[in-house]
Structures are given as C-alpha cells and as structure tokens.
C-alpha cells in the first residue's frame, strides 16, 4: 500500500486504540528526552511554543514549567482528551502536523518528540513547522537512533529480523529510523526552507527501566502502532520466537528487581532563515 492516506488512517486508528496505555507504558521512556530537547532548542520564559504530535502533552507541560506559553496539537482525539485531563491549564487541539491550522509566523519554537516517523509525509510537517515559526525561530525534534547505536532498538530489531515474516502486508510509511544520517537530515531541513548550516544533531542515551523481561515485548505488541501491527500479523509460532528472543536479550540488562535497557535518540535542532 503506497497511498499516504492509508498510512495516516493506520496511524490514527492505532493511536486511538492505544492512547489509554501510553502513560503507563511509554512515558518513563519518552519523557527522559524532553529536558535535553528543550535545552537544545533553548526554550525560554515568555516564548510561544507549539508541541506537535503532542500525545498526552508531556512536552507542552515541560514548556509551561519554564514559563513559556505552550500549545499542543495531535491528530488523535483520544490523546488530546488525555492531554487535557493531565494538563488542564494548557491549550490542546486536534490537528494535522502536515497541515497546521496556525497562522504564519506564530511561534518562537516548534517541538516534536518522536513524532516525525508516525507521519505519512514528514517533509510536509517540516515545511509546516517552518511556516508557523517566526523569523529566527527554532524547530527541535527527536528521532530514534539507528539500532547499531541503541541497544534496545538493536535487540528488538534483531529478534524481528531473525524470526518475523516481513512479507506481511502493512501500510507503507516513512522509514522507522528516519533521518538517521546527518546529511540526509540536513538536506531534508534545507528543502523545507530551514538554515541547514544551523542544524545540530546530537545523540542522547537513557536507560529504559522496566519491571520484567517481557515488558518491552508486551509494550510493542499491545501499546505500539507500527511494531504492534507487524507483530499482530505473525503466526503464533513466529510470535513466540520473537518474544523469547527479546526476553533473552533483555535479561542481560537486569538491575536489582528490574531491568535498565539503554536506548538512544537523536536530538535535532535547526533555525528558520
């Protein structure tokens, strides 16, 4: 399937389905990248900041704590409902990252925490981010690092490559490990109208602390979207092999009564010309 609308519908229905699980499953991982993202983007008191693909609103909440004015948008109504529940003092709207409703030059900063690879047309989202930024404003976003730089991504990727049937039909979307090459990322940003020479591209690593060895597999299967769709289309036999391989790999990261799995992401910041 190569229709971008198919991928958008796939992602939208997926996040509507698992939004209620995000806080309990993924928050302890993805929120670890917010503070370094805000530092890299130099978010300051009094700024106007748009949190794109905001999910439950964690980035917007961190922005607000710095004294900046945050607005969050997400295409998932279920995510927006949770963001409003968790952070009642912040404005959250349903919206499309690839067709923002905001006027030109509205925000000082546009931020996106692990959202680009969930969009059918990341280039459109970059162009829209530039459009709504004020002159000299900054775009900051995070991307999962490629498996060879990120132990968690590698163990999951290795298990899937070894045991999954990759011929199952899934909607065609952007690469999961999007813009992992610095030159590719800079070129995409320049094509969207940003000042490519201003780009910073840093790797940041954290430990994802989980209670059991099967937690990561269960998270991907039941609280993911792209990974969940791939896993759901496997035979019971293949799924069992993937589960076993993931759990065996996680065991090496045992710490105390749980596990601490290293995982890396890229923090990318660029200025509007």
Say what each PLM segment does.
Residues 1-47, 58-62, 78-82, 86, ...:
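Conserved class I S-adenosyl-L-methionine
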Residues 4-7, 18, 199-257:
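C-terminal helical/coil "lid" or tail adjacent to the Rossmann-like core of SAM-dependent
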Residues 48-100, 109, 124:
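Class I SAM-dependent methyltransferase SAM/SAH-binding core
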Residues 50, 107-114, 265:
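Short SAM/SAH-binding signature in class I
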Residues 109-122, 145:
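A short SAM/SAH-binding and catalytic strip from SAM-dependent methyltransferases
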Residues 124, 130-134, 138-211, 231, ...:
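Conserved catalytic/acceptor-binding region of the Class I
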Residues 262-268:
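Short hydrophobic/aromatic beta-strand or adjacent loop that forms the aromatic wall/cage
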């Amino acid at each position: 399937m190569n229709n971008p609308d198919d991928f958008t519908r796939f992602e939208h229905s997926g996040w509507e389905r698992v939004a209620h699980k995000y806080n309990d499953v993924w928050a302890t991982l993805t929120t670890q990248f917010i503070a370094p993202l805000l530092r890299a983007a130099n978010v300051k008191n009094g700024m106007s900041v748009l949190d794109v693909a905001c999910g439950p609103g964690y980035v917007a909440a961190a922005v607000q704590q710095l004294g900046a004015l945050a607005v969050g948008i997400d295409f998932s109504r279920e995510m927006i409902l949770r963001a409003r529940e968790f952070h009642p003092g912040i404005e959250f709207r349903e919206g499309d990252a690839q067709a923002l409703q905001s006027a030109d030059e509205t925000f000082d900063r546009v931020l996106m925490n692990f959202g680009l690879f969930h969009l059918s047309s990341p280039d459109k989202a970059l162009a829209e981010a530039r459009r709504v930024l004020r002159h000299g404003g900054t775009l900051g976003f995070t991307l999962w690092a490629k498996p060879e730089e990120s132990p968690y991504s590698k163990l999951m990727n290795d298990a899937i490559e070894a045991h999954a049937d990759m011929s199952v039909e899934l909607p065609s979307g952007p690469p999961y490990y999007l813009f992992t090459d610095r030159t590719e990322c800079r070129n995409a940003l320049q094509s969207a109208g940003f000042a490519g020479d201003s780009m910073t591209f840093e790797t940041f690593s954290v430990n994802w602390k989980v209670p059991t060895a099967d937690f990561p597999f269960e998270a991907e299967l039941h609280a993911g979207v792209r990974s969940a769709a791939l896993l759901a289309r496997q035979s019971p036999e293949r799924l069992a092999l993937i589960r076993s391989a993931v759990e065996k790999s996680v065991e090496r990261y045992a710490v105390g009564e749980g596990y601490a799995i290293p995982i890396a992401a890229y923090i990318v910041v660029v200025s509007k010309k």
